[in-house]
């Protein structure tokens, strides 16, 4: 890759042949080649940077660019850049390069290069520059392609489409290694380097007449520039043939200077490059400025002049002039907005002043104007109070705000609206960038404070609940809590008050919140502080008063009572003595128990809390002391208060009576009262008698006065009409404004409540609409319109679909790879076993090992068909064959009857292989819901067919081995159900295996033999017990019965655990297995109506437990239930434990009791019966599952509306075999001549060969291993995009359902843009121009989304054409379709076509379900892939383990001492340096020890003449035993300690040696251990 300004890197060394260094010819040639490589790397870097600018995308490093361009993706993207009408992104093959990264180049990558060449041809680039397709794809001449890119860049620059390519020669550095590598590459391909310097001249020679005139004009400009006369230069620039724009005569001097400098620079660069080239060979444009370069320099001068003008205008301070200057195209600045002219002026002027040079460069203006324009749009949105627009503007990347959190954009917008209103009220039109940023920072701080306070709120509530005062105090003192006036001394009281407050809140049912909020906590703290002050005041009063009484200071009592700010009011100085005397008397009455009193004064506050004060230490506390003895002799606060109030009230009462004594006397003496009352009553009686007259007089007088006032007021109004009108208008205005401002203040004061109410209303409305959509039988159109957007397919939908497709491919590929690897490993296991038994040679094993490693390492090369003659070649005939195969497999997928019949037409061995490979491959191993749905339909059809034709009795399902049941179990125990079995059984199985102390053996004879072996092994003496016993005899021994009972108890406990795991995990059971169990039960009931429920459930149990779970329990290592290391295995005890559990569960599932030979286990029969009841309920619930149509939300029309076509990955061999089988059994599976299957098979013709499938030339005909190569290539997988032969392609529906789907899409498009309460109203109302425009925009947006859709996910051409129709034409087409649908009975105009609206509502509901299911499928596929990867890793460990074993064998073969034993760690047993002495015994001695039991045809007294020599061999565990009779060697046998241990494990007590010597196996093992192993 290029590096800039690094001294350690290399640049080329140019020079003449005569140099000071006096180089040799070889050295000069070497330097020339190095310079060529460097120049070519520079051209690569130039092309890379130019393409990155055009594509706005990063390209591979320079040294990797050639390889990165071979797939043509970047070239096709470049073609899309300069010829977008010819090349679209959807036409670019492998646009994301996922296939290229995964499996390298594919022949279809050449399509990208062809599109690039055609695009260059379309814009008129001379073909002399074009490379060949093979130059790019096969890397035959990559420099030619780079040469073409340079020519294209210059051509596009002249057309004004692309920027000019840079000249980087001598400006970038490369390491010596990079230059050398490039030189070697160029030499390797023998490529002649193109003349990059002559591109300009060649383009000029290829120009038309008009372009020749352009060439002449450009030369004239260059000559004028050379002369240096500005006026002459401006004349040549004005020449129309030069096609130059924006030439300003006033800038002639600047043009001359800029162009002259550019020309001199180019001449110097040309001289440097062409020092060794003759002038005849040079290109004219190497020294002359091209038209594009001249235009570029003119634009540069214009831009500089425009920037100068902008800086000058900013100094003048006129916003309008500033706006005009910014708008000039020569300035090359972003768009500006007139309404923000003042802001541009002020902000840019301030920015100019901050600059040290008092000048803004173009780059600074570019950034500033772009940001200010974004701020202007934001201010505009704020003025219109458009929250959505404000939020969108805040998200704009050009505005560049810091710390903008997407989640809080709505709060920013609300805050900015408030700030904007305040600014407008103060006369400020726009908010500056800094003001907006400050507002954002303020909101961020508020949010942070709120979050912090919520956290600390939780801490405080937790501390309150914990009841720890110190912890509560710590949380209250946290700075983020912001709790005021917290006194550490009051910690206990704070805890008490807060706990009481929270308890009250919890007890109030009206309170929804069950925590204390910060305002409630602050209120409680304030209340506690008040309590503290009150308590201290009372303590001061009590102490002062009691001390005053103790000291008998009567003159100080008034001061003590007044100085304490307590609740005692109206303390009168006149009563001082009375206070003192009364208090003394009260205190004297309490001094009886003075000797036993303490020093504590207790004060009760609010009748809830106690405050404790120590009179000795003068300290108070809310915490109860350990020993609280009250000071009984002192008066309490309440007593003092009562006494003072009583004395004061007595005194006041006495004074009141004294003051009122004279008044009472006078009142009693007066006699005026009765006379006045008598006079008043007389007057009232008179008026009552004259009521009518009084009323008339009053009415007349009031009317007269009112008329006088009205007439006077009328005269005043008549004389001041204008004033009256003005006053009235002002009053109305003031009243309205007051009402408005009052309402506004009310809204401001209740903003939070208003927002909540609005949110609740919107939410309620949305809920009502959703309920109507979901729950209503006939949802109205107005509701449906609100939710139709949910039917849109987003980019995320397409990405998820692609990811699902990718994972499906990976899962299917990994399953097949693991299956093949497992077969090879099993074969390897067998071969190693045969090696151990000496049945095959080590060379055979090594040969298979090489094949295995070759597969594991992926060394088998899968050939790509690049000769355009294979099944996927671009020929019409091959394409038709491919499409027919795709239609054939689609038919087999969707019509299960064909495969169901085919399965039963084949022999058992062929059908099993067919099911394991072709069928599961055809359904992608049910890697998605569609395939799982279809596979279940096949299972159902095949199972019903098998039961109908092959099952004669109910028990045949249990006793036989039904093909479909075997297929279902095999599938659900495979990759799809493996995780289920692991989750279901792994924990309990692992627990059983890891329990080393667990021993379950329910065979009495085995228990007996193990007991006898144990006795003999421990004692070393022969047991007196018999070795061969029956079950009944074994059970007579108490030891055996005890061990058996212990085993049964252990068995019951362990079985409970396994049963519990199974019963509780019903939901984990695969749906497919449960559904087939349901089908099995219903099919059996249908064929055998007399079968009882018990019989049916036993059959279900046979499927679910015996066939599916039982083998996994017995052999968990074989079904990947537990993880096993390579070479690891389950020992015999563990396997027996698992087998015992499985046996009990099997009996329980079939409700079979222990009888007959298992009579000794009859104690478990009650347990079996109870367990069966649990199983019975489990089997019933297992069958309670919905139909696949409901479960997967699918039907036969689902494929018509899915985003992507179904794809399967199948090998060539499987395609050929399937084709062959279909032809072989065609008459049986497609009986009707008009059957579609017959039509497809007829189209395909004969079964093709592998070679014809791959295409001619795929295999060398002279290859001696042609057959092996073809066999290997037949396993090559290809992808088939399945399609129906009768897909709708011509725009006409084949049935009412398809027409319904098309009509629904059209209705959805129309209802988006045209309002109306019913469909009929919309269709009858003409669309406005605005609605047509909005509809066109929507369709354009959809077309953009569709353009990014992968080919396999694109909709049919008919649907696309319908989408392009104008609104009115769509409505007419809807009306036609609705009439057709009404004739077929699908809709009715009587209910205003509500049926089709109901279908749309159903689609909306199902879309959410589909997305949810797709996410679940993604997760499920990922889990399956992870499990498969783990399994593959285990197989690789197994391969490595076998490698170690075989390598050890090879190493040992190379040694001369082949007799030494082989171990898996590669180490041989050390060869002894001394000969081992034999152990010698007479037969009589061995007989005495109990080892030897007898010798055939020899008396016991002759045993002393028989001698046995036992010799340890060099092989570990192997012993030679020689026998001698009377000193003569008779025979020799070899003992293997492993064989003896196996016999002991199997319970064999006696064995024969030399065919006549009977020995005790247990005692022989004991003897060998003692003599040779010291144990």
Curated annotation (Swiss-Prot):
Phosphoserine PTM sites in chain numbering: 16, 595, 599, 1279, 1461
Protein role: Binds to activated CDC42 and RAC1 but does not seem to stimulate their GTPase activity. Associates with calmodulin.
Domain (Calponin-homology (CH)): residue spans on this chain: 41-156
Record carries keyword Coiled coil: no
Domain IQ positions: 690-719, 720-749, 750-779
All copies of domain WW, residue ranges: 594-627
Molecular function via GO: actin filament binding; Arp2/3 complex binding; calmodulin binding; phosphatidylinositol-3,4,5-trisphosphate binding; small GTPase binding
Name of the coding gene: Iqgap2
Species of provenance: Mus musculus
Ranges where the Ras-GAP domain occurs: 933-1182
Protein name: Ras GTPase-activating-like protein IQGAP2
């Amino acid at each position: 890759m290029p590096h800039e300004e690094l001294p350690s890197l290399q640049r080329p060394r140019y020079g003449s042949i005569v140099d000071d260094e006096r180089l040799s010819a070889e050295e000069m040639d070497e330097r020339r080649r190095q310079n060529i490589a460097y120049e070519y790397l520079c051209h690569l870097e130039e092309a890379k940077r130019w393409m990155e600018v055009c594509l706005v995308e990063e390209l591979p490093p320079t040294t990797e660019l050639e390889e990165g361009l071979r797939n043509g993706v970047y070239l096709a993207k470049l073609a899309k850049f300069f010829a977008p009408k010819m090349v679209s992104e959807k036409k670019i093959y492998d646009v994301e390069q996922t296939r290229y990264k995964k499996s390298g180049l594919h022949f279809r990558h050449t399509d990208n290069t062809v599109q690039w060449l055609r695009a260059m041809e379309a814009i008129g680039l001379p073909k002399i520059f074009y490379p060949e397709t093979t130059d790019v794809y096969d890397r035959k001449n990559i420099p030619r392609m780079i040469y073409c890119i340079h020519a294209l860049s210059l051509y596009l620059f002249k057309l004004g489409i692309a920027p000019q390519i840079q000249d980087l020669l001598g400006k970038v550095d490369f390491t010596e290694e990079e230059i050398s590598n490039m030189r070697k590459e160029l030499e390797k391909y023998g490529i002649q380097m193109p003349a990059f310097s002559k591109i300009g001249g060649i383009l000029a020679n290829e120009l038309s007449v008009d372009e020749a005139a352009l060439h002449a004009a450009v030369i004239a400009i260059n000559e004028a520039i050379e002369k240096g006369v500005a006026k002459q230069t401006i004349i040549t620039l004005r020449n129309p043939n030069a096609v130059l724009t924006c030439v300003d005569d006033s800038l002639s001097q600047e043009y001359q200077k800029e162009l002259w400098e550019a020309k001199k620079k180019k001449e110097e660069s040309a001289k440097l490059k062409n020092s060794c080239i003759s002038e005849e060979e040079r290109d004219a444009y190497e020294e002359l400025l091209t038209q594009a370069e001249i235009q570029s320099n003119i634009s540069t001068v214009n831009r500089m002049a425009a920037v100068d003008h902008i800086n000058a205008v900013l100094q003048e301070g006129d916003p309008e002039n500033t706006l005009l200057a910014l708008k000039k195209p020569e300035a090359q600045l972003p768009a500006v907005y007139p309404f923000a002219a003042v802001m541009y002026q002020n902000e840019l002027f301030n920015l100019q002043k901050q600059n040290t040079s008092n000048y803004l460069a173009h780059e600074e203006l570019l950034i500033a104007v772009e940001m200010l324009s974004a701020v202007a749009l934001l201010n505009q949105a704020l003025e219109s109070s458009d929250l959505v627009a404000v939020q969108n503007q805040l998200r704009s990347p050009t505005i560049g705000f810091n710390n903008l959190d997407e989640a809080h954009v709505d709060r920013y917008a609300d805050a900015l609206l408030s700030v904007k209103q305040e600014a407008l009220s103060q006369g400020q039109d726009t908010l500056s960038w800094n003001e907006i940023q400050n507002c954002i920072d303020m909101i961020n701080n508020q949010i942070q404070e709120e979050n912090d306070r919520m956290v600390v709120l939780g801490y405080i509530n937790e501390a309150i609940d914990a009841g720890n005062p110190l912890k509560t105090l710590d949380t209250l003192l946290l700075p983020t809590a912001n709790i005021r006036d917290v006194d550490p001394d009051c910690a206990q009281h704070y805890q008490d008050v807060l706990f009481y407050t929270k308890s009250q809140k919890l007890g109030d049912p009206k309170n929804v919140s069950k925590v204390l909020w910060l305002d409630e906590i602050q209120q409680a703290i304030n209340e506690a502080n008040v309590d503290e002050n009150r308590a201290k005041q009372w303590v001061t009063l009590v102490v002062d008063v009691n001390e005053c009484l103790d000291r008998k200071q009567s003159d100080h009592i008034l001061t003590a009572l007044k100085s304490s700010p307590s609740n005692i009011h109206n303390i009168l100085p006149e009563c001082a003595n009375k206070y003192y005397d009364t208090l003394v008397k009260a205190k004297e009455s309490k001094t009886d128990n003075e000797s036993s009193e303490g020093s504590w004064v207790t004060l009760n506050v609010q009748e809830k809390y106690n405050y404790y004060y120590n009179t000795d230490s003068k300290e108070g506390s809310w915490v109860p002391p350990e020993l609280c003895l009250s000071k009984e002799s002192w008066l309490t606060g309440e007593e003092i208060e009562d006494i003072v109030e009583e004395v004061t009230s007595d005194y006041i009462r006495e004074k009141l009576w004294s003051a009122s004594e004279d008044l009472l006397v006078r009142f009693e003496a007066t006699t005026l009262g009765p006379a006045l009352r008598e006079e008043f009553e007389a007057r009232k009686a008179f008026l009552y008698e004259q009521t009518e007259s009084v009323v008339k007089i009053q009415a007349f007088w009031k009317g007269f006065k009112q008329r006088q006032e009205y007439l006077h007021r009328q005269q005043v109004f008549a004389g001041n009409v204008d004033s009256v009108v003005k006053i009235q208008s002002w009053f109305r205005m003031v009243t309205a404004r007051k009402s408005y401002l009052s309402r506004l203040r009310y809204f401001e004061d209740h903003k939070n409540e208003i927002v909540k109410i609005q949110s609740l209303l919107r939410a309620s409305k949305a809920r009502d609409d959703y309920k109507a959509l979901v729950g209503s039988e006939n949802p109205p159109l107005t509701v449906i319109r609100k939710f139709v957007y949910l039917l849109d397919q987003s980019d995320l939908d397409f990405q998820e679909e692609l990811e699902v497709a990718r994972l499906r491919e990976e899962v299917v590929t990994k399953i097949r790879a693991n299956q093949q690897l497992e077969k090879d490993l099993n074969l390897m296991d067998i071969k190693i076993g045969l090696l151990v038994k000496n049945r095959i040679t080590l060379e055979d094993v090594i040969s298979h090992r090489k094949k295995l490693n070759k597969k594991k390492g992926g060394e088998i090369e899968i050939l790509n068909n690049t000769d355009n003659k294979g099944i996927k070649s671009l020929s019409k005939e091959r394409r038709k064959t491919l499409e027919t195969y795709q239609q054939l497999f689609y038919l087999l997928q969707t019509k299960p009857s064909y495969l169901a019949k085919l399965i039963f037409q084949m022999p058992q061995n062929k059908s099993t292989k067919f099911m394991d490979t072709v069928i599961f491959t055809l359904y992608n191993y049910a890697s998605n819901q569609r395939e799982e749905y279809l596979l279940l339909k096949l299972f159902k059809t095949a199972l019903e067919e098998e039961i109908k034709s092959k099952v004669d009795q109910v028990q045949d399902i249990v006793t036989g081995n039904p093909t479909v049941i075997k297929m279902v179990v095999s599938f659900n125990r495979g990759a799809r159900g493996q995780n289920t079995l692991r989750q279901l059984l792994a924990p309990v199985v692992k627990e059983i295996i890891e329990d080393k102390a667990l021993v379950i053996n329910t065979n009495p004879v085995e228990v007996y033999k193990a007991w006898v072996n144990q006795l003999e092994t421990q004692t070393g003496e022969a047991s007196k017990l018999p070795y061969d016993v029956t079950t009944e005899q074994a059970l007579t021994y108490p030891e055996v019965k005890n061990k058996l009972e212990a085993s049964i108890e252990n068995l019951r406990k362990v079985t409970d655990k396994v049963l519990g795991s199974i019963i509780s995990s019903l939901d984990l059971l695969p749906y497919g297995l449960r559904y087939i169990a349901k089908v099995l039960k219903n099919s059996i009931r249908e064929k055998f109506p007399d079968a009882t429920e018990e019989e049916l459930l036993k059959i279900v149990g046979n499927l679910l437990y015996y066939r599916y779970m039982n083998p996994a329990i017995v052999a968990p290592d074989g079904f990947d239930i537990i993880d096993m290391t390579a070479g690891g295995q389950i020992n015999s005890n563990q396997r027996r434990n698992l087998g015992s559990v499985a046996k009990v569960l099997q009996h329980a599932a079939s409700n079979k009791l222990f009888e007959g030979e298992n009579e000794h286990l009859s104690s478990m029969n009650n347990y079996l019966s109870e367990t069966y009841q649990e199983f019975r309920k489990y089997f019933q619930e297992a069958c309670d599952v919905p139909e696949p149509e409901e479960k997967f939300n699918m039907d036969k029309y689902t494929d018509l509306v899915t985003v992507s076509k179904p794809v399967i990955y199948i090998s060539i061999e499987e395609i050929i075999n399937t084709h062959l089988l279909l032809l072989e059994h065609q008459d049986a599976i497609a009986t009707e001549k008009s059957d579609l299957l017959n039509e497809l098979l007829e189209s395909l013709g004969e079964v093709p060969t592998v070679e014809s499938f791959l295409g001619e030339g795929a295999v060398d005909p002279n290859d001696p291993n042609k057959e092996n190569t073809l066999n290997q290539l037949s396993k090559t997988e290809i992808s088939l995009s399945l399609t129906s032969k009768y897909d709708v392609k011509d725009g006409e529906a084949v049935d009412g359902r398809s027409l319904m789907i098309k009509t629904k899409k059209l209705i959805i498009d129309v209802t988006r843009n045209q309002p109306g309460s019913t469909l009929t109203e919309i269709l009858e109302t003409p669309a406005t121009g605005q609605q047509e425009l909005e509809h066109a925009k929507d369709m354009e947006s959809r077309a953009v989304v569709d353009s990014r859709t992968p080919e396999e996910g694109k909709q049919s051409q008919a649907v696309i054409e319908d989408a392009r129709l104008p609104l009115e034409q769509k409505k007419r087409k809807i009306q036609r379709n609705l009439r057709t649908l009404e004739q077929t009975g699908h809709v009715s105009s009587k209910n205003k076509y509500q049926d089709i609206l109901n279908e749309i509502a159903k689609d909306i509901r199902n879309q959410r379900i589909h997305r949810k299911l797709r996410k679940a499928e993604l997760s499920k596929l990922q889990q399956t892939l992870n499990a498969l990867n783990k399994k593959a890793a285990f197989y690789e460990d197994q391969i490595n383990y076998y490698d170690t074993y075989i390598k050890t064998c090879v190493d040992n073969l190379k040694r001369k001492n082949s007799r030494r034993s082989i171990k898996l760690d590669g180490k041989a047993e050390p060869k002894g340096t001394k000969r081992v002495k034999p152990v010698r015994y007479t037969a009589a001695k061995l007989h005495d020890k109990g080892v030897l039991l007898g010798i055939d045809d020899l008396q016991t007294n002759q045993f002393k003449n028989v001698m046995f020599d036992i010799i340890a061999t060099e092989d570990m565990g192997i012993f030679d035993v020689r026998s001698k009779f009377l000193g003569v060697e008779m025979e020799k046998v070899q003992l293997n300690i492993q064989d003896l241990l196996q016999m002991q494990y199997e319970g064999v007590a006696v064995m024969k040696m030399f065919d006549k010597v009977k020995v005790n196996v247990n005692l022989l093992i004991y003897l060998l251990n003692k003599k040779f192993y010291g144990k």
